[in-house]
Amino acid sequence: MKTLNMKPNSTKGFLFTFCGLDGCGKTTMLMRLKSDLEKEHGVFLTKQPTNAVRTSDIFRTYMDCPDHDAYDYRSLSLLAASDRLQHGSRVIEPRLNKGDIVISDRYFYSCLANLRARGFENDDWIYEIAGAVIKPDAAFFFDVPVETAVKRVRSRAAEKNRYIDMDLQYRLRTEYISICKAN
């Protein structure tokens, strides 16, 4: 796997990112970190992709439907990557320039893991885009067994009946681990 050559963080602030499978504990841990840090620092909490992508037809199709033939997954990856670039330059970077600590629930690593887990490991464009993305000061990956993550997701009332592709979850976990080793 190639290394992501992200843009160094040259701001006064700090960027911490949290990635992993749905149900791995990211949100719980980032909320704890936020609670501890905001006692003494300006903290800005965000998530990627933003709601603009999360509410789009293409995103909802992939999240809620077992039939993924309606779209080429790379189109969703490009949408998510463009959202991350826009969000990074217009939201995250200004907060970092102010000296804030920015904590992101998911980041560019999630886009890469999802693309690779779906069989597009040779698509170089994702690595080129990474050059315009700020490298986090610390990136956390939460690794739990797939079964544990899925059980946690299913325990949420709103996601009790959500479609989950178990094979994809195993591949995602493998890709996250590979990304951690390469970066």
Regions picked out by a protein language model, each given a short descriptive name:
Residues 27:
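Walker A/P-loop
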Residues 134-135, 178-183:
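A structural motif corresponding to the C-terminal end of an alpha-helix
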Residues 23-24:
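ATP-binding Walker
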Residues 41-131:
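ATP-dependent small-molecule kinase phosphotransfer cores
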Residues 18:
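Hydrophobic anchor at the beta1->P-loop junction of P-loop NTPases
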Residues 1-15:
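Extreme N-terminal, non-catalytic leader segments
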Residues 111-174:
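A glycine- and Lys/Arg-enriched "phosphate-lid" helix/loop adjacent to the NTP-binding pocket
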